[in-house]
A protein has these predicted regions:
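Bacterial Sec-dependent N-terminal signal peptides
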Residues: 1-24, 527, 531
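Outer-membrane beta-barrel porins/channels
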Residues: 21-35, 40-41, 103-531
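Transmembrane beta-strand segments of Gram-negative outer membrane beta-barrel proteins
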Residues: 22-47, 64-82
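Asp/Glu-centered strand-loop micro-motifs enriched in Gly/Pro and often flanked by an aromatic residue
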Residues: 41-55, 86-89, 206-212
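N-terminal periplasmic accessory domains that precede
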Residues: 57-63
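Short active-site-adjacent helix-start/loop capping segments
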Residues: 66, 80-85, 127-130, 244
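Strand-loop-strand
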Residues: 79, 90-91, 467-469
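Aromatic/His-enriched, Gly/Pro-containing loop or helix-boundary segments
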Residues: 85-100
Length: 531
């Protein structure tokens, strides 16, 4: 395929605002799934005031103070995304070991400080497994990912010289440089051999597939106390392990001015790994001695993540080229790798909960939680030249602006009930709502002064909508052993954009969003022993 197009159309892509990196990583590392023991999930997670479940260690540490017997529990699950498929050897259904923990209840006396409890719990905080596919999507006016590459090939109103030896290469992204190397954008020179701009490619459709897997594993260490069965207080220190993999396969049907078509393809692989730590404090009050009603409050500090990201980008265009030996090749391909270390601080979280029991046959719980996005930060370590170790970091003010412009406070509502159906048999039902984390016109901004700009290898982004979860379960209790089973249905939609071509306002994407369903089914089982 020859590199010749109607250059007059290129003016359509020269848009106003130009922008940079990754608020989407901040959201991924700030949110959490509804996970834990099957009993906890079966009640929609609304157990922070009711307490006496190992998984409440992560939502209100004081709830562990309600244990009167020691406890150990293990949970496994299976998750299915109905519209998923196999990609990168990741199946649509996958099993998971989701929880393992214990509580040691230490009785101190019959009055005053009655119990001092200690506990540990592992659970999967977030399961990143999902699959998105938009195949054969028509584009308007020949829009192509290369249009965004062309925008990125300009800085302060002038075209950048993208030849390998040029210092201008420091002012754009690896994506743009590889797009230039594969002729997806071609330089335009005037009669004086001066660079005046770039010509993009044109497409009549695109196909986009993305698979993600991995997760965030949470390890909680808890100390809690019970004062007179009326005041419960607790402290939890959380340690987090991040393992996130993303594989993207993108292609376009390109068309030239002779209506000849051929295929452009891009693949992007990304691995994000790291650790994090936070502190959670909680209190539960039973204000009326004769009443089982309880009121709880907890606060979670930001999770302080220390992360390493590695990306590999490959492009192959249908444009032929002739090498130095005079051999003509029918296509052009190029690749590149990037890596960056950075730190993320998730938002603060505040939780207000209430719960009560009716006799020995009904338990009711409800709670509200909020995480304010303005507390989130991205920072970069400042390494010592001598030993490479550092505790110092520099805040990314450019991404602070993006967080404020694109992310919203996330509100979570949980309600749940447990009823005694027969001796030792319990039924549970719950509902869980999480508000959308992104504002209406949020987008992946690839033009800021953020240091992350130099490591950007993707143009796609997904604006996630609100989450609705419905849960139901059964539990069986013996003198020591217990077993629980829960089904969870999660409904969520998102708007998928393969790339961003801005309108005159510099924000709104001209590329039409593609709706995607990220619904999933989850079945989990817990076995435990009290002693």
């Amino acid at each position: 395929m020859k590199r010749s197009y109607f250059l007059a159309l290129a003016a359509l892509t020269l848009c106003g605002g130009l922008h940079a990196q990754d608020i989407y990583k901040v959201e991924s590392l700030s949110g959490s799934d509804l996970n834990g023991t099957a009993r906890f999930v079966g009640m929609g997670g609304a157990m922070s005031a009711l307490g006496a479940d190992i998984s409440t260690m992560g939502s209100n540490p004081a709830a562990i103070g309600m244990f009167r017997r020691s406890d150990v529990a293990f949970t496994a699950s299976a998750t299915i995304q109905p519209n998923g498929t196999t990609m990168a050897d990741i199946e649509k259904a996958r099993g998971s070991f989701d929880q393992a923990g214990f509580v040691y209840a230490c009785k101190l006396g019959k009055s005053g400080l009655k119990f001092f409890n200690m506990g540990f719990n592992y659970q999967k905080r977030r399961n990143f497994k999902n699959y998105i596919a938009n195949l054969g999507v028509p584009t308007l006016d020949g829009m192509s990912q290369s249009w965004q590459m062309m925008d990125l090939a300009h800085y302060n109103g002038r075209p950048l010289d993208l030849r390998p030896e040029s210092p201008d290469c420091d002012y754009t992204t690896p994506l743009t440089l590889i797009g230039y190397d594969t002729q997806m954008i071609a330089p335009i020179y005037n009669d004086k051999n001066e660079l005046t701009g770039y010509s993009p490619s044109f497409a009549n459709s695109y196909s986009y597939r993305r698979a993600q897997w991995g997760g965030i594993r949470q390890y909680d260490f808890n100390l809690s106390m019970n004062w007179e069965d009326q005041v419960y207080a607790g402290l939890t220190i959380g340690v987090y392990d991040v393992d996130m993999h993303t594989e993207t396969d993108y292609s376009e049907i390109l068309v030239d001015n002779n209506n000849q078509t051929d295929i452009y393809r891009m693949t992007n692989s990304e691995i994000l790994e790291g650790t994090g730590v936070d502190v959670k404090l909680g209190i539960i009050l039973r204000p009326i001695e004769e009443s089982p009603f309880r009121l709880g409050f907890s606060v979670s500090t930001p999770i302080f993540y220390d992360l390493s990201q590695h990306s590999y980008l490959y492009m192959c265009s249908p444009y032929d080229y002739t090498d130095k030996e005079g051999t003509t090749h029918p296509y052009t391909e190029a690749d590149g790798e990037t890596g960056i270390d950075y730190r993320i601080r998730s938002p603060w979280r505040f939780n207000l909960s209430m719960g009560t029991t009716v006799g020995n046959y009904l338990a009711l719980g409800a709670e509200y939680e909020v995480a304010h996005s303005k507390g989130a930060q991205v920072r970069y370590p400042e390494y010592d030249d001598y030993d490479g170790y550092t505790t110092q970091s520099k805040r990314d003010r450019a991404l602070d602006h993006e967080i404020d412009a694109c992310l919203k406070a996330v509100h979570t509502f949980r309600i749940g009930a447990e009823a005694r159906l027969a001796r030792g048999v319990f039924g549970r039902i719950g509902y869980n709502y999480v508000s959308a984390p992104f504002k209406k016109n949020a987008f992946l901004n690839l033009f800021t002064d953020s240091p992350s700009y130099a490591y950007s290898t993707n143009t796609d982004y997904v604006n996630l909508g609100a989450i609705n979860r419905i849960t139901a379960g059964l539990g069986f209790r013996g003198k020591h052993f217990y077993a629980d089973a829960t089904y969870q249905y999660q409904a969520q939609q998102g708007d998928v954009y393969a790339f961003h071509v801005a309108e005159d306002d510099g924000i709104t994407n001209r590329l039409q969003a593609q709706k995607v369903d990220l619904n999933r089914h989850n079945v989990m089982f817990t076995i435990g022993y009290k002693f």
